Amino acid sequence: MSETGSVVRTFFERMEARDWDGAGTLLAPDLHIEFTETGERFDGGNFLAMNRAYPEGWSIEVVEVLAAGPRVAAQVRVIHRDVTFWCAGFYDVQDGTIRSGVEHWVTEGSESPPVWRRPFTT
């Protein structure tokens, strides 16, 4: 795996381990992360603080990480009690830290497929 991809994978692995200090070393001080589904933006240490404050009972699985130079994409599954969330995250990594990112979150099974697509599904 590339160095930049390893930074993102390691960040999520440290989050899963609740190694908050270790995870924080992988985030740039001027970090900004955007959540598209809510329009929220987290700057600096607020991103890690928000994750740390999230109610316990969750687990993270890094499904896939793809890197092309400083750009890294990650598919991550988060299970919290009986709900599964998916994150498709796209990050910029420089000098061994995540500098920015956009995360697209969905809740598995939370939406019914539209009727018009039924003829195309198996």
Model-assigned labels for residue ranges:
Residues 1-122:
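C-terminal and inter-domain tail/linker signature
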